[in-house]
């Protein structure tokens, strides 16, 4: 049982004036199914994750540094000041390609645009 369902059940049980048991059951079942559907709709979809793990997976897929956005080489050391291109790629890593594509918040003809377009093609090919 989800914690929100337990909260709803407690509210129905301790309501004043007291509700009949069959009405409590009816209300709880109706609310439980609609809340479950809403929770499923709000779950993260593929390529839209915002957790640190999702960001690290994106950085690894792009072969970019998670901290500075630069290409990963054998002797990579993060620089103190990153270029605009690397910071754009870093925003794709941290915010996700689907969000930036929907908002149009990326520079044309940049590395970030290429990363976003490649991921959008991948999403379309997987039919997500």
UniProtKB/Swiss-Prot annotation:
Key words, A-Z: DNA-binding, Metal-binding, Zinc, Zinc-finger
Keyword Glycoprotein found: no
InterPro entries in the record: Viral_NABP (IPR008891)
Any one GO molecular function term: zinc ion binding
Disulfide bonds: none
Zinc finger residue extent: C4-type: 65-94
Record's keyword annotation contains Zinc: yes
Function according to Swiss-Prot or TrEMBL: May act as a regulatory factor during viral transcription.
Protein name: 14.7 kDa protein
Source organism (scientific name): Shallot virus X
